[in-house]
Swiss-Prot record:
Part of the 50S ribosomal subunit. Forms a cluster with proteins L3 and L19. In the 70S ribosome, L14 and L19 interact and together make contacts with the 16S rRNA in bridges B5 and B8. This is Large ribosomal subunit protein uL14. Belongs to the universal ribosomal protein uL14 family. The lineage of its organism: Bacteria, Pseudomonadati, Pseudomonadota, Betaproteobacteria, Burkholderiales. InterPro entries: Ribosomal_uL14, Ribosomal_uL14_bac-type, Ribosomal_uL14_CS, Ribosomal_uL14_sf.
Length: 122
């Protein structure tokens, strides 16, 4: 569960290391985001020659949460930390590589590019 002020690691090669959620998109009073939800983030830590700079604001999709996601068969998939992939204004990934596993819940038409770039789909 991701909410405002939550810090997430970045699971792509855009140059951002850590981002902070500043808004959960999808409804005026929406408080929490889970895997597959789009959030508005600001870059808190970035590499020197990366594609993004500290302080810039982007859309991002949550790909891993410590809270996890419950499947229809009753199983629960949890991760060690929270991670997101940065998106542009058209909701396409900015990076060209994805690091770490992602879940099957991202397999919608909107995020098939992320699933295809990921090294492992759980």
């Amino acid at each position: 569960m991701i909410q405002t002020e939550t810090r997430l690691e970045v699971a792509d090669n855009t140059g951002a290391r850590e981002v902070m959620c500043i808004k959960v998109l999808g409804g005026s009073k929406r408080r929490y985001a889970s895997i597959g939800d789009i959030i508005k983030v600001t870059v808190k830590e970035a590499t020197p020659r990366g594609r993004v700079k500290k302080g810039e604001i982007y859309n991002a999709v949550v790909v891993r949460t410590a809270k996890g996601v419950r499947r229809q068969d009753g199983s629960l998939i949890k991760f060690d930390g929270n991670a997101a992939v940065l998106l542009n204004a058209k909701l396409e990934p900015i990076g060209t590589r994805i690091f770490g596993p992602v879940t099957r819940e991202l397999r919608s038409e909107r995020f098939m590019k992320i699933v295809s770039l990921a090294p492992e789909v759980l």
